[in-house]
Amino acid sequence: MATINQLVRKPRARKVAKSNVPALEACPQKRGVCTRVYTTTPKKPNSALRKVCRVRLTNGFEVTSYIGGEGHNLQEHSVILIRGGRVKDLPGVRYHTVRGALDCSGVKDRKQARSKYGVKRPKA
């Protein structure tokens, strides 16, 4: 236990919180251009072909972003919006592509959880 005098001379150091999404620079979303669109495999015990893309952001960062939902229209040079949120079984993927924003279309024929996939309300 430090004495009062020791604390007066050298106060306790504050713990600095490290961001899980440094490329966003404290913004909710960032715009970027796809440099590569590809599939990758998750780590054990899962098995799939996960759709991801490499994105060069407006602030110069180059990050990997996950493309959620069934089917997408992204290719190289597509302009997309990314948000934070990692994919637990894909190492190094710490961002998600926002569906239905900029060049990324919403998920076709989506009926439930539509707001997460950029889909308008269907006509009754």
Swiss-Prot record:
Keyword line: Methylation, Ribonucleoprotein, Ribosomal protein, RNA-binding, rRNA-binding, tRNA-binding
GO MF: rRNA binding; structural constituent of ribosome; tRNA binding
GO CC field: small ribosomal subunit
Domain of life, per lineage: Bacteria
Gene Ontology BP terms: translation
Residues with PTM 3-methylthioaspartic acid: D89
HAMAP family the record matches: Ribosomal_uS12_B
Protein family per UniProt: Belongs to the universal ribosomal protein uS12 family.
PANTHER family: 30S RIBOSOMAL PROTEIN S12 FAMILY MEMBER
Entry function: With S4 and S5 plays an important role in translational accuracy.
Quaternary structure note: Part of the 30S ribosomal subunit. Contacts proteins S8 and S17. May interact with IF1 in the 30S initiation complex.
Protein name, per record: Small ribosomal subunit protein uS12
Source organism of the structure: Klebsiella pneumoniae subsp. pneumoniae (strain ATCC 700721 / MGH 78578)
